[in-house]
Amino acid sequence: MTSRYRVEYSLKQHRRDEFIEWVKTLLATPFVLHAGSTGDGRPGDENRSVVETRRRYAEIFYDVEKLIENQLYHDNNDSGERARLRQLVPTIGQFFTKLPLERAFYTQDEIRSISHRRFVSPSFNDVRMILNTAQVMALATGRQPLKLVTFDGDVTLYADGGNIDPDSPIIPVLLGLLRNDVYVGIVTAAGYSEKDGSKYGVRLYGLLEAIVKTDTLTEQQKNHLLVMGGESNFLFKFIAAENRFEWIDPEEWTLPEVRTWSQEDITSVLNIGERVFTNALTKCSLPATIIRKVRGVGIVPLPGKKIMREQLEEMVLAAQKTLETSKATGNVQFCAFNGGSDVWVDIGDKDLGVRSLQAYLGNITGTQTLHVGDQFAALGANDFKARLAATTVWIANPSETVEIIAELIDYIEHERQCSA
């Protein structure tokens, strides 16, 4: 029952990624025609089948790789609507780099045995992991060096509602990024407006302790950790010598378009979100309470209680649609998202959060930035908008974050050795 439920739930339209689904359909034909028979065959038949299947899969990824290059060309020449990939997948977003998908496929095939499988076709996760590997390969070998890696918090760096403890496996790879002169930015929905940054210090204390104590980082590298809280509302910089976060005045990093937002429009967005949650609380008799913050409003379960998944989805979609059709929101950007156990409407989004960091750190470009997150569905997910600002990798849990960043560091250091 659980497995069937999860499969049916994952097929909901708003939870799908059309590009990944499209690639899966391309891979279905070689799986059906070349993945091998189930009965006994002549000696060597199975090996020949694997070789042929791998070749066909690789050809498809090579062709998709060329389609992405074609889209990059058209986007750079203001003729994006003529890109073949955009015609085939109308919802496709922006690419910042080429993606070596064929090479990434061979790498992931060794790990996931995609070509050897006869009963399970290439899956959503197979394609997702190939895209992730291709992206970090491209960043490590690009003409412009990687300068900034940003992370979501919950489910990306630590378990939902958790912290980075001193023994967290995420710490060594984050230190590895800093050691390679890459800024680390945590762009989180957690919105703590207190200027001392102490609450972020509690959530990240294991990482902060490791940065302060390590002798493998320079003093400058130790200060290359930043936190953007509330999606795009509060910026803090770590001061290693004092083991604390320093609040950065918004005048130093707020983007020009955000400066035009009026407090009246911001209040209107939060009021509408609160009304949606209040209505759901009453109508569905939810065991929850509503929390109003400076730049966000959310509905969270009472201690020891749980809001069902369908109820969370109903609220996030209701909030999104209500806000989209309301003239009262003015030109304020907002983010309605399902946090896994709660639902929030925040002022701003991760597009603004990542771009604000890029501007603050010296106009870092999207091709020099990677965002790592777990929520990339088109609706109800707060990492989705980061695709407008930077390259991205889509992970499912903190363990995958460790793996992909370790992979990225390996590629960076290998590239440096080859060019030395």
Curated annotation (Swiss-Prot):
The cross-references to SUPFAM superfamilies, in alphabetical order and at most eight, read: HAD-like
**What is the annotated quaternary arrangement, including any partners?**
Homotetramer.
Q: How activity is regulated? A: Allosterically activated by ATP. ATP binding is a prerequisite to magnesium and substrate binding. ATP binds to 2 of the subunits in the homotetramer inducing a closure of these 2 subunits and the release of the C-terminal loop, thereby activating the enzyme.
- What EC numbers are recorded for this enzyme? 3.1.3.99
Q: Which residues form the active site?
A: D152 (nucleophile), D154 (proton donor)
UniProt KW Metal-binding keyword: yes
Q: Which Pfam families match?
A: ISN1
Question: Could you tell me what this protein is called?
Answer: IMP-specific 5'-nucleotidase 1
Q: What does this protein do?
A: IMP-specific 5'-nucleotidase involved in IMP (inositol monophosphate) degradation.
Cofactors needed by this protein, per the record, are:
Mg(2+)
Question: Where does the chain bind IMP?
Answer: D152, D154, D160, T188, D342, K350
Classification via InterPro entries: HAD-like_sf (IPR036412), ISN1 (IPR009453)
Q: Which GO terms describe its molecular function?
A: ATP binding; IMP 5'-nucleotidase activity; magnesium ion binding
Species in which this protein is naturally found: Yarrowia lipolytica (strain CLIB 122 / E 150) (Yeast)
